[in-house]
């Protein structure tokens, strides 16, 4: 079954009939189906080997599963692509990014071994910094793509705009784009010398160039979500905007938004375009079958078809696992290192309803490192836990998922208030009585809350739910958005003044405009650099690790001084 049209169907059944046939052929040793198979991974976030190095447990989905498919089909009979965000998200890649920089990086090592043909850069790849992604680029035996990441000095793409691949008698062009929103999240130091241009205009610029190559197929490899029809190409997720408004693409592989989706659309020239979106962390493999063509004329084999393959339906390659067994053991040893001890178990779940030991530990570390007056921090995961007992390196990836830097910025008291109003507007509903929802969930057209994997789905990402430490305040959820927060004083009891200036500790994502908090506070993106007092040289997780090493023993408890009112509605 090939799924088109209704994206909801992909949640019910994402394995296609063609995949079922392919698996039968793998078992029987028969020849693979006619046509060219294109496979694409996206948003792997370090899930290269069958082991979750943060949880310390084996997993049934990784590139070990893909390795068995490559061996069966053969690299000459397939095009293999990656759609970015591979360099961040697991201790495995962190180790090779920053701890062991002398050996070949694990990402090009594995992708070269699997005969990848091309990859597009993602925003989390850029977040590792020039030293890392430039090194990875040098070590890859295939091109890294991003036509809209432009070298400021030359005016040409910093990475390759596209690549030409010839397989099974077909000439395939793969064109890469990265989400243009990178500057909204990352400090300029991480992409110095690069500007990010909007996607539709960039695709229009390069389409005539690519068509002069007389390809049989043009494939988009976009590290950007599908998005909406009304987006213009400068939005975070603009793949659909390109598909609809830039004729010439046959297939577009999407990513970044971690959604699973397949849909066929008709562009403004009346041509069909297939879009696939492939989730994250090697859960699924995007797949398109290209019928044999000559000069872009479809043969009698039919139209391009697509599917999402559940990665764990492919058997893992034992040869692949054995090849990288030393790497697996190295990372196990690295993540098992004891750095201290916690005298309490803490969870992010508490943080959604008031002060929590988990988030307040982040607050305390940020305030201690920065010396700031106030700290802003959020629960980066919905349901994360650090248990009482020995603290290991892997626990630091639970405490802080992202490789953000720590910034100290200047804000007035009024701006602090508006910042918090925005945060709690993302976070809490306006309640009329104690039976109303406190948290802002997503609701369907029938007014029922949306459930995903048995869990209510929040309207906004929890990493945007910033609370504050260093001040005493309440959040009145009976009042409308924008007028809920009342700041009584600083934590030491001294007055808090709207017109006074305070030093505030925030992560680099927030300090560069992520989440819209600073914009809501009245601080535009262009104003942000002038507000920066200082920034760390390394990621915040590194400093948290060293802070705990120095302390040796910690007792994380709720320490921030804020509460939700009316109390009898929320208790």
Place the predicted regions along the sequence by residue.
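Intrinsic-disorder/low-complexity regions
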Residues: 5, 75-76, 491
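Catalytic centers of hydrolytic enzymes
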Residues: 34-37, 46-56, 60-72, 108, ...
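Bacterial N-terminal signal peptides that target proteins for export
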Residues: 9-18
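Acidic, metal/ion-coordinating pockets
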Residues: 30-313, 353-365, 375, 425, ...
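Bacterial N-terminal signal peptides
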Residues: 18-26
């Amino acid at each position: 079954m090939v799924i088109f049209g209704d994206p909801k169907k992909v949640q019910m059944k994402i394995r296609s009939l063609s995949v079922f046939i392919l698996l039968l052929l793998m078992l029987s040793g028969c020849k693979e189906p006619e046509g060219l198979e294109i496979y694409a991974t996206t948003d792997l976030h370090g899930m290269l080997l069958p082991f979750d190095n943060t949880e310390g447990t084996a997993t049934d989905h990784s590139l070990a599963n893909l390795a068995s498919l490559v061996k069966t089909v053969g690299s000459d009979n397939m095009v293999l692509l990656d759609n970015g965000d591979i360099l961040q998200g697991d201790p495995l890649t962190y180790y090779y990014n920053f701890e062991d920089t002398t050996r070949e990086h694990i990402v090009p090592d594995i992708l070269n071994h699997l005969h990848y043909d091309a990859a597009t850069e993602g925003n989390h790849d850029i977040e590792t910094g020039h030293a890392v992604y430039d090194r990875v680029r040098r070590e890859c035996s295939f091109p890294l793509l991003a036509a809209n990441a432009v070298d400021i000095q030359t005016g040409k793409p910093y990475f390759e705009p596209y690549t030409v691949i010839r397989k099974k008698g077909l000439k395939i062009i793969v064109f890469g784009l990265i989400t243009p929103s990178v500057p909204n999240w990352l400090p300029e130091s991480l992409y110095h010398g690069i500007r990010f241009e909007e996607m539709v205009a960039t695709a229009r610029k390069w389409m005539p160039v690519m068509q002069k190559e007389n390809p049989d197929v043009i494939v988009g490899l976009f590290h950007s979500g599908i998005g909406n029809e009304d987006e213009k190409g400068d939005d975070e997720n603009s793949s659909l905007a390109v598909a609809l408004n830039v004729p010439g693409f046959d297939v577009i592989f999407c990513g970044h938004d971690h959604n699973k989706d397949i849909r066929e659309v008709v562009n403004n020239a009346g041509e069909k375009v297939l879009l696939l979106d492939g989730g994250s962390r090697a859960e699924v493999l995007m797949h398109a079958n290209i019928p044999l063509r000559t000069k872009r004329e479809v043969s009698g084999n039919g139209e391009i078809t697509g599917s999402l393959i559940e990665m764990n339906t492919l058997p893992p390659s034992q040869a692949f696992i054995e090849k990288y067994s030393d790497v697996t053991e190295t990372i196990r040893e690295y993540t098992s290192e004891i750095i201290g001890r916690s005298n309490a178990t803490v969870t992010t779940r508490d943080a959604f309803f008031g002060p929590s030991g988990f988030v307040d530990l982040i607050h305390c570390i940020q305030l201690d490192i920065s010396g700031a007056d106030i700290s802003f921090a959020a629960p980066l995961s919905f349901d994360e836990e650090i248990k009482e007992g020995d603290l290991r390196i892997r626990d630091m990836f639970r405490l802080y998922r992202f490789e953000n830097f720590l910034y100290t910025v200047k804000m007035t008291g009024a701006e602090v208030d508006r910042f918090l109003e925005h945060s709690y507007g993302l976070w809490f509903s306006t309640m009329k009585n104690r039976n109303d929802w406190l948290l802002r969930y997503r609701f369907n057209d029938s007014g029922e809350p949306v459930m995903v994997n048995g869990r209510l789905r929040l309207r906004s990402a929890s990493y945007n739910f910033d609370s504050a430490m260093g001040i005493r305040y309440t959040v009145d959820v009976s009042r409308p958005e924008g007028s809920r927060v009342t700041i009584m004083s600083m934590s030491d009891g001294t007055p808090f003044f709207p017109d006074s200036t305070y030093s505030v500790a925030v992560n680099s994502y927030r300090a560069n405009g992520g989440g819209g908090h600073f914009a809501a506070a009245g601080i535009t993106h262009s104003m942000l650099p002038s507000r920066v007092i200082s920034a760390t040289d390394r990621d915040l997780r590194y400093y948290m690790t060293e802070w705990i090493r120095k302390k040796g023993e910690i007792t994380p408890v709720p320490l921030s001084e804020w509460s939700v009112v009316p109390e009898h509605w929320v208790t």
